Swiss-Prot record:
Annotated region described as Disordered, given as residue ranges: 58-78
Name of the encoding gene: XYLD
Thermal behaviour (record text): Optimum temperature is 50 degrees Celsius.
Domain spans labelled CBM1: 19-52
Source organism phylogeny: Eukaryota, Fungi, Dikarya, Ascomycota, Pezizomycotina
Family (UniProt): Belongs to the glycosyl hydrolase 10 (cellulase F) family.
Name of the protein this chain belongs to: Endo-1,4-beta-xylanase D
Organism of provenance: Gibberella zeae (strain ATCC MYA-4620 / CBS 123657 / FGSC 9075 / NRRL 31084 / PH-1) (Wheat head blight fungus)
UniProt xrefs under SMART domains: fCBD, Glyco_10
SUPFAM superfamilies: (Trans)glycosidases, Cellulose-binding domain
Summary of pH dependence: Optimum pH is 6.0.
Regulation: Inhibited by the wheat xylanase inhibiting protein I (XIP-I).
Major location category of this protein: secreted
């Protein structure tokens, strides 16, 4: 989702240290290059360095993932993942990245409650292939290794997205080059993790709010053809992985982005033989009375499930205020939608959320379960 581009610290250089998740370096960066106490400045890619929890003096190292757990990796049968699987779904997951692996309270929750993980940033194009043909997998590998060592399913996120896209890709203006670059990127990344990824978000956020295609660099050069190019390359690289189209604001049943956007386009593309297995609804939801509250989500999910796909999934769930009944509404919508295979919340604790100010997650800033967690756990009993 929208993370790196939204958390840049705008404090003048030399006047203030960057706060947690703020930018602290990178090509063209003119702001602060130091982080507040308790944080370290870590390279995400050549263009973006970020303040993350840890110390530059020996802290923040990646822990030994240990011996792989048997089966699905849930040591606690009372965890959310174990409960939702008992209801016939595949997983209850969360978002993490390599910079979370040294956070023991967070990781202990992941091990107990969640059976699937999605990389927040380290599988995006700017992190994986910052320069043409030069692939950097070290940070993504850390999350994949952790997931495999602990029996967690993995959602690959994301192969094509208009944001966090290197400038060299944006500069491409001819069809042949763009096609070749997409095919090579998708093939290389998917092949590296072949057999390890359950779901791939092949294309992410490709629709405008009116249901038309977003005017991304991919669309400017290739029109809608980039969708088929990406999905076919992914299918060829790993025939077993389920391939998804993922987007936000798919939370109102009659909204144009849902109907004439996602559903109509997906039905057309599937009829053309493009191997789209599923639709991912990010579900970044508002409070009651907001534009896209949880109350409208069940009807919207059923509209998405009516498309000609095998699966739907809730991929980046967070809810402004995290009201218990709102979370239960969304969880029940998946339980009552046969095509819905699982739920991923976009982060573990409010402290680590990209919407931190709205306290949108299941655990508070001290990594303690909130009322929403208890309500979800009870709903899954």
């Amino acid at each position: 989702m929208h993370f790196l581009g939204l958390v840049v610290a705008f404090a003048p250089a030399a006047l203030a240290q960057s706060a947690i998740w703020g930018q602290c370096g990178g090509t063209g960066w003119s702001g602060s290059t130091t982080c507040q106490s308790g944080l370290k400045c870590e390279k995400i890619n050549d263009f973006y360095y970020q303040c993350i929890p840890g110390s530059d003096n020996g802290g923040g190292t990646t822990p030994d993932p240990g011996t792989p757990s048997p089966g699905n990796g849930n040591a606690d049968a009372t965890g959310l993942d174990a409960k939702i699987r008992a209801k016939g779904k595949i997983y209850f997951g969360t978002e993490i990245d390599h910079y979370h692996l040294s956070n023991n309270p967070l990781i202990n929750i992941v091990k107990k409650d969640f059976g699937q993980v999605t990389n927040e940033n380290s599988m995006k194009w700017d992190a994986i292939e910052p320069s043409r043909g030069q692939f950097t997998f070290s940070n993504a590998d850390k999350v994949v290794d952790f997931a495999q060592a602990n029996g967690k399913k993995i959602r690959g996120h994301t192969l094509l997205w208009y944001s966090q896209l290197p400038q060299w890709v944006k500069n491409i203006r001819d069809r042949a080059t763009m096609t070749s670059v997409i095919e090579n990127h998708v093939k290389t990344v998917v092949t590296r993790y072949k057999g390890k990824i359950l779901h791939w978000d092949v294309v992410n956020e490709i629709f405008a709010e009116d249901g038309n295609m977003r005017n991304s660099e991919f669309y400017q050069v290739l029109g809608e053809d980039f969708v088929g190019i990406a999905f076919r390359a992914a299918r060829a690289a790993d025939p077993a992985a389920k391939l998804y189209i993922n987007d936000y604001n798919l939370d109102i049943a009659n909204y144009a982005k849902v109907t004439r956007g996602m559903v109509d386009h997906v039905n057309k593309w599937v009829s053309q033989g493009i191997p789209i297995d599923g639709i991912g609804s990010q579900a970044h939801l508002a409070k009651p009375g907001g534009w896209n509250p949880a109350s409208g989500f069940p009807a919207a999910l059923k509209v998405l499930a009516g498309a000609n796909v095998k699966e739907v999934a809730i991929t980046e769930l967070d809810i402004d205020g995290a009201a218990a009944n709102d979370y239960v509404t969304v969880v029940n919508s998946c339980l009552t939608t046969p095509k819905c295979v699982g739920i991923t919340v976009w982060g573990v604790s409010d402290k680590d959320s990209w919407r931190s100010e709205s306290n949108p997650l299941l655990f508070d800033r001290n990594y303690q379960p909130k009322a929403a967690y208890t309500a979800v756990s009870n709903a899954l009993n």
